């Protein structure tokens, strides 16, 4: 299902004043793109993106006010369609009577703000991009470890929440437990958050549900985090060969983004929190251009080439 935002949400978010068209506040906004309809006001009606929120600033209104009333009414009627989610007048300018009349007849929300046009456009676009971003929900835990968003996944009961608790005790920050809502806010950018119902909560078998912020303080949690690394916990399988060098980098596709993926086998005696902590630090090192596995492979190849028997 395609995400959508109602015009009423824009009004509330940016404290906009409603001039007319309150009955149309339920209209959906399906794109983050906005429109400054200068060509429509000039009389060119082809390719008018009526489904976008329309922004009228100083340039558009100055031109519009120089038209005859009949021309104003004609072009205002083109602006106001059944699918237009709203028309926003910026900089606190007076709303032309022709636009008020057309918006009132078609129930198009006519809004005003005192903000500058460019600033308002930028803020609304950023808000819509976040709200309309492709979204999915995944089972797991998201923790901020040294600034790296690590998504811990695995079968139920494998120890994800317990590992997250140990990480929080070691000074890292919990974002979400059990269910992580993930939005793709841009190319290659995934941001995870917790559903409001379970925000800051951890479920520990044998204890129950605990409030991490209450127990460990506000510094132990955060509301959202970009996902940079996925660690999959699985019960150790003796028949399976696990990566012992780290040359091959697997990835996991979430929505349309490929994220570095590590499989961490679980068995008694392995400190998962420390292992995941080191995985996050190693990820940061790789981003800084330091790849220990590749350096080792290079040294090994050089030693073999030199016939070094001291291996």
Swiss-Prot record:
Catalytic reaction equation(s): [HPr protein]-L-serine + ATP = [HPr protein]-O-phospho-L-serine + ADP + H(+); [HPr protein]-O-phospho-L-serine + phosphate + H(+) = [HPr protein]-L-serine + diphosphate
Active site, per annotation: 139, 160, 178 (proton acceptor), 244
Renumbered residue ranges of the record's region Important for the catalytic mechanism of both phosphorylation and dephosphorylation: 202-211
SUPFAM superfamilies documented for this protein: HprK N-terminal domain-like (SSF75138), PEP carboxykinase-like (SSF53795)
Positions annotated to bind Mg(2+): 161, 203
UniProt keyword S-adenosyl-L-methionine, yes or no: no
Pfam families named in the record: Hpr_kinase_C, Hpr_kinase_N
Region named Important for the catalytic mechanism of dephosphorylation: 265-270
Gene Ontology molecular-function annotations: ATP binding; magnesium ion binding; phosphorelay sensor kinase activity; protein serine/threonine kinase activity; protein serine/threonine/tyrosine kinase activity
Domain of life: Bacteria
Primary enzyme class: transferase
Assigned keywords, A-Z: ATP-binding, Carbohydrate metabolism, Kinase, Magnesium, Metal-binding, Multifunctional enzyme, Nucleotide-binding, Serine/threonine-protein kinase, Transferase
Quaternary structure (record): Homohexamer.
Function: Catalyzes the ATP- as well as the pyrophosphate-dependent phosphorylation of a specific serine residue in HPr, a phosphocarrier protein of the phosphoenolpyruvate-dependent sugar phosphotransferase system (PTS). HprK/P also catalyzes the pyrophosphate-producing, inorganic phosphate-dependent dephosphorylation (phosphorolysis) of seryl-phosphorylated HPr (P-Ser-HPr).
Family listed: Belongs to the HPrK/P family.
Additional free-text comment from the UniProt record: Both phosphorylation and phosphorolysis are carried out by the same active site and suggest a common mechanism for both reactions.
PANTHER family: HPR KINASE_PHOSPHORYLASE, PROTEIN YJDM-RELATED
Protein known as: HPr kinase/phosphorylase
Organism field: Exiguobacterium sibiricum (strain DSM 17290 / CCUG 55495 / CIP 109462 / JCM 13490 / 255-15)
Lineage: Bacteria, Bacillati, Bacillota, Bacilli, Bacillales
